[in-house]
Amino acid sequence: MNAPASPAASPSQRARKPDWIRVKAPTSPGYAETRKLMRELNLHTVCEEAACPNIGECWTKKHATVMILGDTCTRACAFCNVKTGMPRPVDLLEPEHTAIAAAKMGLSHIVITSVDRDDLPDGGASQFVKVINALRRETPQTTIEILTPDFRNKPESAVAAIVDARPDVYNHNLETVPRLYPTIRPGARYYASLRLLESVKRRDPSIFTKSGIMLGLGEERMEVHQVMDDMRSADIDFMTMGQYLQPTPKHAKVIDFVTPQAFDAYAQIARAKGFLQVASSPLTRSSYHAGDDFEHMRAAREAQLARVRAD
């Protein structure tokens, strides 16, 4: 994992996926029903837009990560398959449609993410608030996890407004190690993302915070360990690690396919550093098994508090 990251690769250079990263094409009735509902409500999902390898499994179970604020991002990260350009105006019906979808699917846990909207004064924070409020009204039993952009160069009040809307989990991904930011995530700043997550916990310590990185981009083992330490310094509760997969030949190429055993080893180290929850495998993505992971994290916090009270 010492090779430098390359910004792109030709089709002939694209590495062949090992067996452990291969998944079956989605064909189930549950998948078709989820897809139909999203179309009817004019909702976008990161599952489709980012070409997630787990879409078949998740949609079969009627789990979907709704991507608000449209399907066009104002940035062009080297790893991401979401299209870039000038976005359309914000859909005023999106909050209500998202809540209707959650209710119809009977979701116990929902993940809401978005494209970057650098064109909006608050980066789209107010739309997150509206979606959270609509979900609370329509399906109050559903726990809410949000995965936000970094709101770079936006007022601090943008993130504060989302925190005050009380999502159950606030996720913002660091994506990769600091050294690779100039080529992999050039529109963002590593320490700014850490500060965002710190600010969430500082404003409302009861909200679970979560972040993740991709592996296979040329990062070194000790760099991954340092990211873990940085996350714990920011009091992040949940860390995810998954294999980067090159969406198209225009995107950053895969430097190596990290073995399942290496992912397990990283998970052991992360748990030893004090995270309440760790998800680490080749197919791990931010919202993969998010509902189950939330329950495990909540139970881990309760056990932790019980130990403190006992002492």
UniProtKB/Swiss-Prot annotation:
Q: In which pathway does it act?
A: Protein modification; protein lipoylation via endogenous pathway; protein N(6)-(lipoyl)lysine from octanoyl-[acyl-carrier-protein]: step 2/2
Q: What is its EC number?
A: 2.8.1.8
Binding-site residues, [4Fe-4S] cluster 1: 47, 52, 58, 287
Main localization, broad class? cytoplasm
Ranges for domain Radical SAM core come to 59-276
User: What GO molecular function annotation could you give as one example from this UniProt entry?
Assistant: 4 iron, 4 sulfur cluster binding
SMART domains noted in UniProt: Elp3
Q: Which cofactor does it need?
A: [4Fe-4S] cluster
Report the subcellular localization.
Answer: Cytoplasm
Binding-site list for [4Fe-4S] cluster 2: 73, 77, 80
Q: Which Pfam families match?
A: LIAS_N, Radical_SAM
Catalyses: [[Fe-S] cluster scaffold protein carrying a second [4Fe-4S](2+) cluster] + N(6)-octanoyl-L-lysyl-[protein] + 2 oxidized [2Fe-2S]-[ferredoxin] + 2 S-adenosyl-L-methionine + 4 H(+) = [[Fe-S] cluster scaffold protein] + N(6)-[(R)-dihydrolipoyl]-L-lysyl-[protein] + 4 Fe(3+) + 2 hydrogen sulfide + 2 5'-deoxyadenosine + 2 L-methionine + 2 reduced [2Fe-2S]-[ferredoxin]
Cofactor, how bound (note): Binds 2 [4Fe-4S] clusters per subunit. One cluster is coordinated with 3 cysteines and an exchangeable S-adenosyl-L-methionine.
Cross-referenced InterPro entries, in alphabetical order?
A: Aldolase_TIM (IPR013785), Elp3/MiaA/NifB-like_rSAM (IPR006638), LIAS_N (IPR031691), Lipoyl_synth (IPR003698), rSAM (IPR007197)
What keyword terms does UniProt attach to this protein? 4Fe-4S, Cytoplasm, Iron, Iron-sulfur, Metal-binding, S-adenosyl-L-methionine, Transferase
Q: GO cellular-component terms in the record?
A: cytoplasm
HAMAP family linked to this entry = Lipoyl_synth
- Return the similarity comment: Belongs to the radical SAM superfamily. Lipoyl synthase family.
Name of this chain's protein: Lipoyl synthase
The protein's organism comes out as Sphingopyxis alaskensis (strain DSM 13593 / LMG 18877 / RB2256)
